[in-house]
């Protein structure tokens, strides 16, 4: 099985390795964007930095979900420059990627919190923080209804 080291648009000390599904073996190239799941639910577009056959020992590899580019959008020279910039400016390659790529090339999932109108909430049983959160969500919902 092949693996890819992916630069994620996050402030991470290192890049993470993802598995390349068999159907993408011939298509994934260094410099292409791929869609990966990082964490339990977050989905990001990352840049393939390196392709290899070394399975990580300390964590379970997740597969690349999707290939976003047919051809690389970043050259190997640019990737080397990003690494140099990260070292020189004491930041991560993910932070350099965030600054270097236009926002429409970055895929980031978002989490939305909404009230379930079918559930009745007992305000007496809520902690102070829970009460404030519910109150803020109710205010936001009422403002949407006005517009």
Locate predicted features:
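Accessory, non-ATPase domains that flank or precede helicase/AAA+ motor cores in DNA-metabolism machines
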Residues: 1-147
